[in-house]
Structure formats: C-alpha cells, structure tokens
Amino acid sequence: FYTQGDYGIWQCSRPCHHETYDNRKIVEKMVEAQGYTVAADGTLLAPQRAALKMTVPSELVPHCPKCGAPMTMNLRADSTFVEDDGWHKAASRYDDFIRRHQGMKVLFLELGVGYNTPGIIKYPFWQMTAGNPKAVYACINYRDAACPTELQNQAICIEGDFERL
C-alpha cells in the first residue's frame, strides 16, 4: 500500500485530474539516454568507456496527457498528491486488514519511515501498538530507529543500512 506515494508512478503536477501513470518504460529510456544499459533482469550497467551524459533529452520529459503540464512523481509532499483508484483500493484493503486483526498478534513493521509526515505511518503504528498488548512495533531505520518509552516492551528498533542487516 503506497500511502505516501510511489516513485514508480507519475501524476500531473497541477494536478488537473486524479489518474496516475506507470513510469518504468520512460525512466528506462531516460537512464539509457544517459549511457546506461538496462539488463533483462533490470540491473543497470554503467558504460565501460564513455562518461555518463547526466542529462535527459527534452523529448523524454513527461507531460500530462490532459493539460500538458509537467508530470511529477506521485509522492505525498503537499496538497497536490493524487490518490488514484489503485490507492483507494489499497487503502480499503489495508483498513480491512487492520479491522480484522484488532486485538490479535500483529507486527507493525516500519522500514525507513522518517518524520516528513509522521501522522501517516509512524504515529498510527504507535497508537495501534499501544492499544493492543499482543502487537509488536518494529522499526528499521538508517539513523533514527526509535519509539516512545511507553512502547519499549512491545518494540524492536534497529538502526542500520538495510543492505547490511
């Protein structure tokens, strides 16, 4: 559930409508235009002998198909965040899961969540853990793995790089 957005989709920067668009193919073209090769498994291969171009050709810059404004990442940064149909369906599934598992053993796993918008993930996880003695809050974060002292008996906080843990 991409409650905070998804780097893999674009939305109109205005936004003039509430649809999002998969950006994988165009991002691959942007990466290739800089000199990389994208392997069949998605691995990026840097050029062996040439320097990276570090620019994207203007014809690859995405524009809204409805109004022509530049497209932007679908990230909850301000009031322009688009909650599309897929977002609402995922939110409904999440709410249903939370409702069906109240009072049961639940792991609230928080991976790399910061304090940009703590009211979306972090604080609700803390509240749901505090309200359920069978719940566990687990936080893995590069530099800021913490929880309120009231949750310390129900929490696991690990600081470190995901790739090394």
Set out the residue ranges of the language-model regions:
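Conserved catalytic alpha/beta core of Sir2/sirtuin-type deacylases, generalized to analogous enzyme cores
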Residues: 1-165
